A protein has these predicted regions:
Chain B
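Bacterial N-terminal signal peptides
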Residues: 8-20
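Extracytoplasmic small-molecule ligand-binding "clamshell" domains
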Residues: 26-90
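An extracytoplasmic/periplasmic, membrane-proximal ligand-sensing/linker region
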Residues: 27-34, 38-49, 216-284
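Short loop->beta-strand "edge-of-pocket" segments that line small-molecule binding or catalytic clefts
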Residues: 28-37, 43, 127-144
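A local structural motif
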Residues: 55-65, 153-164, 198-200, 280-284
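Short helices/loops that flank or line small-molecule/ion binding pockets
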Residues: 71-85, 97-98, 127, 168-183, ...
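Hydrophobic/proline-rich hinge and linker segments of small-molecule sensing/allosteric domains
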Residues: 102-125, 213-217
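Pocket-lining segment of extracytoplasmic ligand-binding domains
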Residues: 121, 132-230
């Protein structure tokens, strides 16, 4: 049964497996039948020969007695000649008491069976004698030999006939299976077409039930499945449409609200700066602290609004992406330059290990925005006096990786699932680190919009590495 | 199937001289010829035990010799081919030169020739046979052919004879209706009818003739002939001999008394007279 579990066997077409199985079954059954039939034939032939010999021994003396008593040797010779014409009679000899001998020998029967078969049958010629006694007087003795060759030939021919019948049965079996399965499995191809149509989106595709009861049940089940899938997909489409409408409404709302918020916020920041830098009426210390609070809170709010606006543009599909060859080093240097003051505030060393020759297929603004977010996060969540490294490396054929490596405290395992969720700051909401919580969300959206990938690796107490991968130019 | 016969050998030792074949087969045995009246096997079943008995009693081995037909028997008798012979054809003039001499006759009553038909036959008298086909055992059958044919000729009844080869043969033909009437040995017919369940009607019967005698050839020494005659004649008084006679007698349907009596040619004088005066010229 090992072959029936092997992959190569299971890969064979169903029809072939069925035919092979049926053929093996027929061959085994046929071989057993032939074996036992031939063995029985051999046994019967052996018994027949013995029976015939006994019968001849019983009847032959009476048959020749008349001419033996008369001493009519010519007639006796004719009788012996006729006897060797009988089935299986090889030779017959009569010898009287004085030594007169008459003999008749049949022509040897030409063997038609191969030697191994004759040997396997184990049939030997049989011989016997019979006394010709009439009225108590012994006239002589008849010796006769029956050949087994005829029986061997008959059994061999019968075996060949059985083999021919077996071959015919296998042929009919093949033809029958092929015809039945060809007709019976025809609906499968239509079922296959239907499944392909479903896969290609034709949810209205249905198959007319046909064929055997089993096939009809299968087709009915397929149609039921298609029906359920169509209903399910309809629900999903409606849900998606509803979600898209809601998302667009939300984006529109956020965009509108952000615009509406940014205008007064800019006024607030502007007037705060005026107050801070008014040389005619300088602020006292308390006022200075209060104005600094207003400006810091305003900057944070403005940053938040900018990020929200970016996210809204991406989700609404209004973000325009222009893919071109971008030298990563230039984008990295600009980001470092923009964030250097913050790094200096934290006493963080920023290292640029970007290959100056590395160029990727990206939107320059988007790439700069992503790198800016990652570098900004790397500075904000680094330890004081730590280090931030920008590094480039190949990433598979045709791809390049840009990594931002910090030496912060790392991201705990239990918080990583919410890393790219918008407004999720992983428990830093109450800290003195300012942030909006949507930087990584925007970075992921932008990276994927450029056809790239984003990921990270982090070790608690050692730091984190955020990377993006983009096609090389 | 003869085409299948590859080889047929006849290795014959002395086959060219079949005359003394019995003697060759039995060494110094004397031949004992029997007129072919029954099948050879039945004849052998009857006579071989008797001959074995004689050998046991006298030390003289007798080898049975049976010819295919009665004419062949007669040819051998005519040539003096048998040392002893059981036949009544020795009385034919043509056989006289052989010189056989009667030494024993059956204890049974004398035989007669009968012309018979089946009991339900439309033939009721000999005259009804005029112009008909009548069966006979063979030209060599004395009471089966010579005597009845002589009578039919003397009565002016013309019949067309057909021959059955021997007594059994013609009786068999009568039984199955192949012949409407047959001339037979009265005793043989009686035994056959008893054995085969045949009911028959006798149309004519001849004068009695002593049944077939056992005769001896002049070449056989007198003491040997006498010893054989005594042994056979004494069988009826010897329990072992009687047992053999009874058993063999039953085989051929004989009725008692069994065995033979010493005899002489005088007991068969009517045979000689018949052959001298008969109108039948084709007796074998």
């Amino acid at each position: 049964m090992a072959q029936f579990r092997s992959p190569s066997w299971n890969r064979l077409p169903f029809v072939v497996r069925l035919m092979v199985t049926a053929t093996i079954a027929l061959l085994v059954a046929g071989a057993a039948m032939l074996f036992f039939s031939a063995r029985q034939d051999a046994e019967d032939a052996r018994s027949d020969l013995a029976g015939q010999l006994q019968a001849e021994r019983e009847t032959l003396p009476a048959a020749v007695a008349e001419v033996v008593v008369i001493g009519d040797f010519s007639t006796l010779q004719q009788i012996l000649d006729r006897y060797v014409g009988r089935q299986s009679m090889a030779s017959i000899r009569f010898q009287d008491a004085s030594g007169v001998t008459l003999e008749s020998v049949d022509a040897p029967i030409t063997p038609v069976a191969p030697a191994w078969f004759a040997s396997w049958m184990d049939l030997a010629d049989v011989s016997g004698t019979a006394a010709v006694v009439v009225g108590g007087h012994l006239y002589g003795e008849v010796a006769l030999t029956l050949t087994a060759q005829g029986a061997v030939n008959r059994v061999w021919r019968r075996l060949l006939n059985h083999l021919a019948i077996l071959a015919l049965a296998i042929g009919i079996d093949f033809l029958g299976i092929w015809l039945v399965l060809r007709q019976g499995l025809a609906p499968l191809s239509r079922l296959q077409d239907g499944a392909r149509a479903l896969a290609e989106g034709d949810m209205a595709k249905r198959i007319a039930p046909e064929g055997s009861p089993e096939m009809r049940r299968l087709i009915t089940a397929f149609n039921d499945m298609a029906e359920a899938t169509q209903r399910s997909q309809d629900r999903l489409v409606r849900a998606r449409d509803d979600a898209e409408i809601a998302s667009k409404a939300k984006s529109k709302f956020l965009s509108s609200m952000s615009h509406e918020l940014r205008t007064p916020l800019n006024s607030i920041l502007g007037f705060a700066q005026v107050l801070d830098f008014d040389r005619r009426q300088p602020l006292n210390a308390d006022q200075k602290v209060s104005v600094d609070h207003i400006m810091r809170a305003g900057q944070q709010l403005l940053e938040l609004i900018e990020q929200v606006l970016d996210l809204a543009r991406i989700e609404s599909g209004r973000m325009t992406i222009s893919i071109e060859d971008v030298v990563v080093d230039s984008a990295a240097r600009e980001c470092i330059q923009l964030t250097q003051p913050h790094a200096d505030d934290q006493d963080i060393t920023v290292l640029n290990e970007i290959d100056p020759r590395m160029a990727v297929r990206a939107d320059w603004k988007c790439l700069r925005q992503v790198l800016l977010n990652l570098v900004s996060n790397g500075i904000k969540y680094n330890r004081k006096g730590g280090r931030l490294t920008l590094r480039s490396s190949p990433s598979g054929p045709g791809w390049g990786r840009i990594s931002v490596i910090d030496t912060g405290e790392g991201i705990p395992e239990d918080l990583r699932d919410g890393l790219f969720e918008p407004f999720n700051r992983l428990g830093k909401e109450g800290s003195d680190v300012m942030g909006t919580g949507i930087g990584l969300t925007v970075s992921r959206e932008l990276t994927e919009a450029m056809g790239g990938r984003i990921g990270y690796a982090s070790a608690v107490g050692e730091g984190s590495t955020f990377w993006i991968e983009l096609p090389l130019a | 199937m003869l085409h299948r016969i590859f080889k047929a050998l006849a290795v014959v030792v002395g086959i060219a001289s079949l005359g003394p074949w019995h003697a060759a087969a039995a060494g110094d045995a004397l031949s004992f010829g029997v007129l072919s009246q029954r099948s050879a096997v039945l004849t052998a079943q009857y006579w071989n035990p008797v001959l074995e008995y004689v050998k046991a009693k006298t030390g003289t081995a007798l080898a049975l010799k049976v010819a295919r037909t009665a004419p062949e028997s007669n040819e051998s008798i005519k040539a003096g081919g048998y040392d002893f012979v059981y036949s009544n054809t020795i009385f034919q003039p043509a056989m006289a030169d052989a010189g056989y001499r009667v030494i024993l006759r059956p204890r049974t009553e004398a035989i007669a020739s009968h012309i018979v038909t089946l009991e339900d036959s439309p033939i009721t008298s000999l005259k009804d046979l005029d112009g008909k086909v009548v069966g006979f055992p063979s030209l060599a059958a004395f009471v089966g052919y010579a005597v009845p044919m002589d009578h039919l000729m003397r009565e002016g009844i013309s019949v067309t004879p057909v021959f059955g080869g021997n007594q059994e043969g013609i009786m068999g033909q009568l039984k199955v209706g192949k012949v409407i009437a047959a001339a037979v040995n009265s005793q043989v017919m009686r035994a056959f009818a008893a054995r085969e369940g045949v009911r028959y009607r006798i149309l004519w019967g001849s004068e009695p003739f002593n049944n077939l005698p056992i005769s001896v050839h002049p070449s056989v020494p007198g003491d040997v002939a006498e010893a054989v005659r005594t042994a056979i004649a004494d069988m009826a008084t010897d329990p072992e001999g009687m047992r053999i006679l009874e058993e063999t007698g039953k085989l051929v349907g004989q009725k008692p008394p069994y065995g033979f009596l010493p005899s002489s040619p005088d007991d068969y004088a009517n045979y000689v007279e018949f052959y001298r005066t008969t109108l039948v010229k084709d007796i074998k």
